[in-house]
């Protein structure tokens, strides 16, 4: 009779029950975390390429008007709504490269940063 009453008055969890819950949460985290981080990296890479494409559009538009490619990144902020888009892979607005080997060709590339892991950015080639 005393054992039954002591079981009824028992409140809380035993150490074994808590350890089992912590173990289960650890296993679930170990399975889910790599997938989550991979998804985050993929979305950052996609955003960096999308921003580079928007920059390429602005570069091409200004080149059509001026008949030459300008490689100064800051010159395109007004064409992009007032500011250069943030490169989520580098965490900066200077994470894009504009190169113009000739006055009639240019390439725009998003820089590879530590926030995205290993990836190959899309190179946007432009020609006047």
Where are these regions (language model features)?
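Periplasmic/extracellular, small/polar-rich flexible segments of pilin-like filament-forming proteins
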Residues: 57-128
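N-terminal single-pass transmembrane signal-anchor helix
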Residues: 10-36
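Aliphatic-rich helix starts adjacent to a transmembrane/signal segment
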Residues: 36-54
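Conserved alpha-helical elements of the SDR catalytic core
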Residues: 32, 39, 59
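Conserved amphipathic alpha-helical interaction elements at protein-protein interfaces in regulatory
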Residues: 3-6, 42, 61, 65
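N-terminal leader/signal peptides at the extreme start of proteins
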Residues: 1-13
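Short, charge- and proline-biased low-complexity linear segments
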Residues: 27, 52-58
């Amino acid at each position: 009779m005393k054992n039954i009453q002591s079981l009824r008055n028992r409140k809380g969890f035993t150490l074994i029950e808590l350890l089992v819950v912590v173990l289960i949460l650890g296993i679930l985290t170990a399975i889910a975390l790599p997938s989550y981080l991979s998804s985050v990296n993929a979305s950052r890479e996609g955003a960096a390429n999308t921003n580079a494409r928007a920059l390429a559009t602005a570069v091409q538009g200004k080149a059509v008007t001026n008949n030459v490619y300008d490689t100064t990144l800051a010159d395109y902020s007004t064409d992009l709504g007032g500011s250069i888009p943030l490169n989520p892979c580098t965490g900066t607005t200077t994470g894009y490269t504009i190169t113009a080997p000739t006055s009639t060709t240019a390439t725009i590339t998003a820089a590879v940063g530590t926030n995205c892991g290993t990836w190959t950015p899309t190179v946007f080639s432009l020609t006047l």
